[in-house]
Amino acid sequence: MALLPVLFLVTVLLPSLPAEGKDPAFTALLTTQLQVQREIVNKHNELRKAVSPPASNMLKMEWSREVTTNAQRWANKCTLQHSDPEDRKTSTRCGENLYMSSDPTSWSSAIQSWYDEILDFVYGVGPKSPNAVVGHYTQLVWYSTYQVGCGIAYCPNQDSLKYYYVCQYCPAGNNMNRKNTPYQQGTPCAGCPDDCDKGLCTNSCQYQDLLSNCDSLKNTAGCEHELLKEKCKATCLCENKIY
């Protein structure tokens, strides 16, 4: 899986930086708080529902404690770079978006900045220019991703970008084979008519295929084959679900 690009945003400096990041503006962003978790999930679902062109198979996102633990652990390292994909795995591979700021910024603003990369993206074509950064957007709206967990850290070891936001996404998006079409275009919920909640699908799959030809392997070898049991769990175990 390709690493996502990192978004750097320099915001206006506060008159003084807090010791150890204990100021109320920072602690209000900690993702141990239910209201912060709701803000993050609701913002993601609001944006996923609003994609243009509309999506027929966009899953509704939910908060994951396991994913949050991984995201917070990585944020605490204050490296300002992506984690090793192996360190953010759950039952599936997981993606990751990063945001850095010089002062505390709301989660909604950070998430919106990732989505705003849509301005440099054309559905079905890809980035508008070779240097355009769109990987945060495509991960955020990846149709089969349904779990999100985020963490934030204050990083006094950094010169200016001292606030480090990390969101991880499971299953991972940005599959190189279909990165230019992060979802299926169509009427909302057309791909999940019996599992729809306000324009988003709820029939998620907890597994992920590790091979690109699992459908054909299922037809030729069957799901009892050891290879499919290990590498094609979504195809074999998630009938009528989105993966």
Swiss-Prot record:
Paired cysteines (S-S): 189-196, 192-201, 205-238, 214-232, 223-236
TM stretches of this protein: none
Gene3D superfamilies assigned: CAP, Crisp domain
Reported function: May regulate some ion channels' activity and thereby regulate calcium fluxes during sperm capacitation.
Compartmental location: Secreted
Tissue/organ expression: Testis and epididymis.
Record-annotated ShKT domain positions: 205-238
Assembly and interaction partners: Interacts with NSUN4 isoform 3.
Signal peptide interval: 1-21
Recorded GO CC terms: extracellular space
Name of the gene encoding the protein in the UniProt record: CRISP2
A family per Pfam: Crisp
Membership in a protein family: Belongs to the CRISP family.
InterPro entries (UniProt xref): Allrgn_V5/Tpx1_CS, CAP_dom, CAP_sf, Crisp-like_dom, CRISP-related, Cysteine_rich_secretory, SCP_CRISP, ShKT_dom
SMART domains reported for this sequence: SCP (SM00198)
Species, as recorded: Homo sapiens
Protein name: Cysteine-rich secretory protein 2
BP-aspect Gene Ontology terms: sexual reproduction
All residue ranges annotated as the SCP domain in the record: 41-169
